[in-house]
Curated annotation (Swiss-Prot):
The chain crosses the membrane at residues 693-713. InterPro entries: Cadherin-like_dom, Cadherin-like_sf, Cadherin_C, Cadherin_CBD, Cadherin_CS, Cadherin_N, Protocadherin/Cadherin-CA. This is Protocadherin gamma-A7. Residues 804-841, 902-932 are annotated as: Disordered. It is found in: Cell membrane. Residues 922-932 have a biased composition (Basic residues). It comes from the Eukaryota. GO terms for biological process: cell adhesion; homophilic cell adhesion via plasma membrane adhesion molecules; nervous system development. It comes from Pan troglodytes (Chimpanzee).
Length: 932
């Protein structure tokens, strides 16, 4: 409650002097309230919200609270009403003893702006204490010859209350021998004295009993009594006398317990019992007997407990000396306690932030504390310091308040916890200090993006990997903490060969493990460029990127593919021509193969596995060239079969084989003449041919043996002439259509027909039979076979000879002329200047087959001009089609041919570096064959 007016002091109002200033600045005035002691808990003291210019609800919002400097909290704030109320029972005498005015001061802290407001509350005394005597029995000895009017001091009563509530009067029970006199001391204390009114007579009454009553001025007044026992003794005409009316001593507060402080001394001139003096305390508080000891015989005063300047700096007491009969006198004792530096400074935290964000601006207040030292003077002067290497500084506020503020930017990643040591030192000698540690946690903010150890990575994975296999572990680091350091991984959206990157690989968003979603094929995909993004979980989130190159490593999963000679589709056997005049080292043909793999897996080597005539042919290990190993002999068979293996150098190695049929002859007529010794290949066409022959022979033999033979010969002769005429005129209408076998968009090389020559021994007539083809150089399609009228064609050589003048070969079409370099073969063995392309459609294929058939017909007539040089298969330059590897797939670059300069290019060249021989030589040989 507010202080009430008292006397002329106008304190019936609350004095509020407020000077507005910057945060942390002190108010120039103080707020004064008053409250009576012993009020109930929660009693109203003052409207603090109104006096601070706030609404009650703002007390909690702005963090208004009481700071009491370590003393027991006597007051509290009512957050609802905005009032200052009592926190419990208040005892004025306990707080201020007998001080005339009892003020309790504390501060109000407004935390939002760190403002301090000093508050004073005056504790109003109430009459809650009864005057009490030090002892309830007072013994007084009076000589019987004592004259009336003599005064005998009595023990006074004490009342802790002040003002009118303190001790005001004494009363003595009615008695005819005694009266009561009251004396007042300099400090206003009242001392009762017993006045002798009439002479005592010991023989009449030895003991007198009186009652002394002490009363205060409260409303209602309170009182207590003490019993006085007056003993009448014999005459004692001297009283003790102290050597000094007042004794003074000054001692330091740290004197040991039991130290003698001083000695009081009184003299009594009487002798015997009347002269024996005893000492005792007269006017002391209840606490003094616990602090000091007075030797009743010697008058020595010593300490019973340690002195504490901070509790009591000055003691005042009275001692009395009494002789045997009871005469007494009194003296005052003053003890002054000197302060020594025995208390270290104390640090009291008023406001402290246990955690601050790392982006806190400079000058932010993070702590408010109060320094105090219970010592006085220089011993109580306190200074405070912190280490210099910290991003903080101390600023002094009002009284002994200090604030701790930031001076530099904080970085949690550099230092996340600060141990701030506050060292408070007093000015004593020697100085005392105390350290207080403040642990300041720096809260993280998302100021660091995730980082990868490297900006790019190269990862290698073998092809044919299993789906779902882990490829690589991507890791990123974030120097932040908690959610700000929680990283998730993702792949940037992109397309690879028209498909999204997510169809190739995936990434675990938590662990960063890359997984392959499909089995990679080196031949289709050799490299993937990925971009991995790492995001943290901060607000806002930060991210960084990393590029990853995923290289697919080749495995030996593709066997070599043979481009030449091309594998036929109808079961026929390929054939190459080797002249009998060929010398050792003559290039017969070249096996061309490629491997879709790369590196060692595509490094091919060639090996002759099997040959019908061992030692006759040799195959280049790295070139695939089939050459004669020795000169050809007459005993060497016309048909030579070679099995060539092509093997790569992978682990394990893969291989492919091809069977070559080499005809040993100088020209096609010679081949046609000697073809009877060659066994036709087993196939469906040969089976049908045999059946037709058997049926024809049986029919002729059984029914029309002679007639049918003649008639059939004539019919066949006419039919054959018409065919030759058509062929010589360039019509080529009856030439069967052939198809070529393709491999990887590369057309197969030209195939040749297999011929069987049947020579009868009985006449001039011989039959040249053209059965189903079985040579590698030409294939007859099923469609062509079905269009022919018959499968056998007979030619009478004698009749043809007679009819030569009537059958003239038409001049060849110049559009069909080809250079010698255009014969079937590989680009690596051709050195001609002309270049050409593979047949790329059915029309070109049929045209080439027609040329081959025409040349074969001329050779059968003996007037062929197709005599070829060595290795030309009897074809002249004009009919030698140009075949190169221009259209070989791109993987031909993978072919390694160690030890050779030959490469798979489009450049044409000569077969063996020799010019083709003229056609006349072959014609002569053909003539010889006819004579046979």
């Amino acid at each position: 409650m507010a202080a009430q007016p008292r006397g002329g002091d106008c304190r019936g109002f609350v004095l509020l002097s407020i000077l507005l200033g910057t945060p942390w600045e002190a108010w120039a005035g103080r707020i004064l309230y008053s409250v009576s002691e012993e009020t109930d808990k929660g009693s109203f003291v003052g409207d603090i919200a109104k006096d601070l210019g706030l609404e009650p609800r703002e007390l909690a919002e702005r963090g208004v609270r009481i700071i009491s400097r370590g003393r027991t909290q006597l007051f509290a704030l009512n957050q609802r009403s905005g009032s200052l109320v009592t926190a419990g029972r208040i005892d004025r005498e306990e707080i201020c003893a007998q001080s005339a005015r009892c003020l309790v001061n504390f501060n109000i802290l407004m935390e939002d702006k760190m403002n301090l407001y000093p508050i004073d509350v005056e504790i109003i005394d109430i009459n809650d204490n009864v005057p009490r005597f030090l002892t309830e029995e007072i013994n007084v000895k009076i000589m019987e010859n004592t004259a009336p009017g003599v005064r005998f001091p009595l023990s006074e009563a004490g009342d802790p209350d002040v003002g009118t509530n303190s001790l005001q009067s004494y009363q003595l029970s009615p008695n005819r021998h005694f009266s009561l006199a009251v004396q007042s001391g300099d400090d206003g204390t009242k001392y009762p004295e017993l006045v002798l009114e009439r002479v005592l007579d010991r023989e009449e009454e030895r003991v007198h009993h009186l009652v002394l009553t002490a009363s205060d001025g409260g409303d209602p007044p309170r009182s207590s009594t003490a019993h006085i026992q007056v003993t009448v003794v014999d005459v004692n005409d001297h009283t003790p006398v102290f050597s000094l009316p007042q004794y003074q001593v000054t001692v330091p507060e740290n004197v040991p317990v039991g130290t003698r402080l001083l000695t009081v001394h009184a003299i009594d001139l009487d002798e015997g019992v009347n002269g024996e003096v005893t000492y005792s305390f007269r006017k002391i508080t209840p606490k003094l007997p616990q602090m000091f000891h007075l030797n009743s015989l010697t008058g020595e005063i010593s300490t019973l407990e340690g002195l504490d300047y901070e509790e009591t700096a000055f003691y005042e007491m009275e001692v009395q000396a009494q002789d045997g009969p009871g005469s007494l006198t009194k003296a005052k004792v003053l003890i002054t306690v000197l302060d020594v530096n025995d208390n270290a400074p104390e640090v009291t935290m008023t406001s402290l932030s246990s955690s601050i964000p790392e982006d806190t601006p400079l000058g932010t207040v993070i702590a408010l504390f109060y320094l105090q030292d219970r010592d006085s003077g220089k011993n109580g002067e306190v200074t405070c310091t912190i280490p210099e290497n910290l991003p903080f500084k101390l600023e002094k506020s009002i009284d002994n308040y200090y604030r701790l503020v930031t001076t530099k930017n904080l970085d949690r990643e550099t230092l996340s916890l600060y141990n701030i040591t506050l060292k408070a030192t007093d000015g004593g000698t020697p100085p005392l200090s105390r350290e207080t540690h403040i642990f300041m946690q720096v809260a993280d903010t998302n100021d660091n993006p995730p980082t990868f150890p490297h900006s790019s990575y190269s990862v290698y994975i073998a092809e044919n990997n299993p789906r779902g296999a882990s490829i690589f572990l991507v890791t990123a680091q974030d120097h932040d903490s908690e959610d700000n350091a929680q990283i998730t991984y993702s792949l940037a959206e992109d397309t690879i060969q028209g498909a999204p990157v997510s169809s190739y690989v995936s990434i675990n968003s938590d662990t960063g493990v890359l997984y392959a979603l499909q089995s990679f094929d080196y031949e289709q995909l050799r490299e993937l460029q990925l971009r991995v993004t790492a995001h943290d979980s901060g607000d806002p989130p930060l991210s960084s990127n990393m590029s990853l190159s995923l290289f697919v490593l080749d495995q030996n999963d593709n066997p070599p593919e043979i481009l030449y000679p091309a594998l036929p589709t109808d079961g026929s056997t390929g054939m190459e021509l080797a002249p009998r005049s060929a010398e050792p080292g003559y290039l017969v043909t070249k096996v061309v193969a490629v491997d879709k793999d790369s590196g060692q897996n595509a490094w091919l080597s060639y090996l002759l596995l099997k040959a019908s005539e061992p030692g006759l042919f040799a195959v280049g290990l790295y070139t695939g060239e089939v050459r004669t190993a020795r000169a050809l002999l007459d005993r060497d068979a016309l048909k030579q079969s070679l099995v060539v293996a092509v093997q790569d150098h992978g682990q394990p190695p893969l291989s492919a084989t091809v069977t070559l049929t080499v005809a040993v002859a100088d020209s096609i007529p010679e081949v046609l003449a000697d073809l009877g010794s060659l066994e036709p290949s087993d196939g469906p066409y040969n089976y049908d041919l045999t059946l037709y022959l058997v049926v024809a022979v049986a029919a002729v033999s059984c029914v029309f043996l002679a007639f049918v033979l003649v008639l059939l010969a004539l019919r066949l002769r006419r039919w054959h002439k018409s065919r030759l005429l058509q062929a010589s005129e360039g019509g080529l209408a009856s030439v069967p259509t052939s198809h070529f076998v393709g491999m990887d968009r590369v057309q197969a090389f030209l195939q040749t027909y297999s011929h069987e020559v049947s020579l009868t021994a009985d006449s001039r007539k011989s039959h040249l039979i053209f059965p189903q083809p079985n040579y590698v150089d030409m294939l007859i399609s099923q469609e062509s076979c079905e269009k022919n009228d018959s499968l056998l064609t007979s030619v009478d050589f004698q009749e043809c000879k007679d009819d030569v003048p009537s059958i003239q070969q038409a001049p060849p079409n110049t559009d069909w002329r080809f250079s010698q370099a255009q014969r079937p073969g590989t680009s690596g063995s051709q050195n001609g200047d002309d270049t050409g392309t593979w047949p790329n459609n059915q029309f070109d294929t049929e045209m080439l087959q027609a040329m081959i058939l025409a040349s074969a017909s001329e050779a059968a007539d003996g007037s062929s001009t197709l005599g070829g040089g060595a290795g030309t298969m009897g074809l002249s330059a004009r009919y030698g089609p140009q075949f190169t590897l221009q259209h070989v797939p791109d993987y031909r670059q993978n072919v390694y041919i160690p030890g050779s300069n030959a490469t798979l290019t489009n450049a044409a060249g000569k077969r063996d570096g020799k010019a083709p021989a003229g056609g006349n030589g072959n014609k002569k040989k053909s003539g010889k064959k006819e004579k046979k």
